[in-house]
Amino acid sequence: MENQFQDGKEEVIEAWYMDDSEEDQRLPHHREPKEFIPLSKLSELGILSWRLNADDWENDENLKKIREARGYSYMDICDVCPEKLPNYEAKLKNFFEEHLHTDEEIRYCLEGSGYFDVRDQNDQWIRVAVKKGGMIVLPAGMYHRFTLDSDNYIKAMRLFVGEPVWTPYNRPHDHLPARKEYVEKIINRGGTQAVEAR
């Protein structure tokens, strides 16, 4: 399943190493010179990604196949923008605090765009830009954070295995079993394979 629905993925998902600037989090934060990384590097970190048809997601057979294969039984849609998200500034601040989850974080961008920041094996930040049509799965136990870009809008589908649980564990939470498993499978082994869903 990880190797399907890849055509044109680079048009909706892009990744690069971030600078250390404290400027507005919604800016791209490229290093100078820019250091783009291949999406295969994300796979090495356990991240799954696909390009799907966001204009017809209700009838998209590819989305259905992914959901069935990975057990994503629950779905909802959220708009993240100042006009539609209550307590917008506080929520965005929470999303941008570095954290992990004990389950996968699955997001499918239906409209707009945003940034998922993840850590590589050397604890360096990688910024993953996701646009309309991009679907990304961050493995359980991976430290990450999210922010909008300067357009200040994303409409995202959230997917879950079973009941929706979004519990962030802010760094450090290295003692959690999900983190230990992620470190063992990805970090200690040099990131050679995607983490399988439980």
Curated annotation (Swiss-Prot):
GO terms for cellular component: cytoplasm; nucleus. Its cofactor is Fe(2+); Ni(2+). GO terms for molecular function: acireductone dioxygenase (Ni2+-requiring) activity; acireductone dioxygenase [iron(II)-requiring] activity; iron ion binding; nickel cation binding. The keyword Isomerase does not apply. Ni(2+) binds at H99, H101, E105, H144. Its EC number is 1.13.11.54, 1.13.11.53. Induction: By submergence in root tips and lateral roots of seedlings. Down-regulated by water deficit. It is an enzyme of class 1 (oxidoreductase). Binds either 1 Fe or Ni cation per monomer. Iron-binding promotes an acireductone dioxygenase reaction producing 2-keto-4-methylthiobutyrate, while nickel-binding promotes an acireductone dioxygenase reaction producing 3-(methylsulfanyl)propanoate. The keyword Hydrolase does not apply. It is found in: Cytoplasm; Nucleus. Fe(2+) binds at H99, H101, E105, H144. It comes from the Eukaryota. InterPro entries: ARD, ARD_euk, RmlC-like_jellyroll, RmlC_Cupin_sf. Belongs to the acireductone dioxygenase (ARD) family. Catalyzes 2 different reactions between oxygen and the acireductone 1,2-dihydroxy-3-keto-5-methylthiopentene (DHK-MTPene) depending upon the metal bound in the active site. Fe-containing acireductone dioxygenase (Fe-ARD) produces formate and 2-keto-4-methylthiobutyrate (KMTB), the alpha-ketoacid precursor of methionine in the methionine recycle pathway. Ni-containing acireductone dioxygenase (Ni-ARD) produces methylthiopropionate, carbon monoxide and formate, and does not lie on the methionine recycle pathway. This is Acireductone dioxygenase 2. It comes from Oryza sativa subsp. japonica (Rice). The gene is ARD2.
